[in-house]
Amino acid sequence: MLVYRRSAGRGTGRRVAVSAGVAVSIVLSQVLAIRGLVLVVNRDFGFFPTWSSLAAASEDDNPFAAVAQPASGGAMTTDELKQIRVRGWAPRKVQPPKGDGLYRDYVVSGVQSGTTAKVVVWMPPGHEHAANAKGLPVVFVLGGAYGPVDNVATSLQFAQKAAPLIRSKQIPPFVAVMPEVNIKLPQDTECTDYPGGPQAYTWLARDVPAWAQHTLGVVQPGPRWSVLGWSLGGYCAAKLHAAEPQTFGSGASLQGYFAPSVDGSTGTLASVLQRDPALRQRSDVAWLLRNRPPARTRLLAMSSPADAQSWQLTQQFLGATKGLPGITPMVVDNAGHTYTAWREALPRTLTFLLKDAGAKG
């Protein structure tokens, strides 16, 4: 601004040029400041370990969706709601390529949790228009915090990853059930029930399984049911398998964690856990596996040294459960905390979960 004042009397053209230069300088300084902030956040949270991983993630709708996705609540159109009232479900507007199955939207009201939310279901190739999924195995698919359930299907490209495995007979046909995890936005539920808070655990462990069995006609809960998730959903998946092995015979945590991650977004959960040691224990996957182990543990724990959010927590969990059977680590190099990493891990994860599921229908 001092340059502008000293030049003020030297002609309009000079003033315009200097003003433009000042404006450009301000814009550039803001861009550099934002770039620096992004680099600091990326350094601390490990979204993109390399420039190439950043370039690969550019195809995502929002590569930061696991932790920064604005809540959409999975809003449904009037036409979709009309179809659901008539036949119980509506086809999603965005479908996978032909031959890769079909996405269906449902609205589920949980009696025990008091929650009503969207559930997306993927019907495998050959079962797209079946009245139900009689006898098929089930995989629950759980997304991250603040990422609406719609992202679980589309950003993960779930159908495009799962369908080729079925066609090549590497895994049996199965139904993917994708319930809304974020049932009380903007509060992060941590998949936990607690007094005065949302009954998020009951929604996932009781209501949605009961609905899936009744509505979809799938095989009964047990060895042929499994659950996978990433980030927050990875914690939920690990906890559901450890605490509900009679429902979920196997589980997979992709760059998740293994005990509640409490902060300003989790409401009163931190104080509740501090006052209630029993709830704190029931929410700790390592404690559950050490003290109340399933008859048969089958848990996959995927992480990457490049992921600052999950690597240390996963190593701590593996150390705390060392010697316990049925826990399989999966290390992926240079995998940031992005949909790109979870997409790439999906084929190996599904093969792990469905290896012994078999196919009956």
What would you call each of these model-derived segments?
Residues M1-G361:
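Non-catalytic cap/lid and distal C-terminal segments of serine-dependent acyl enzymes
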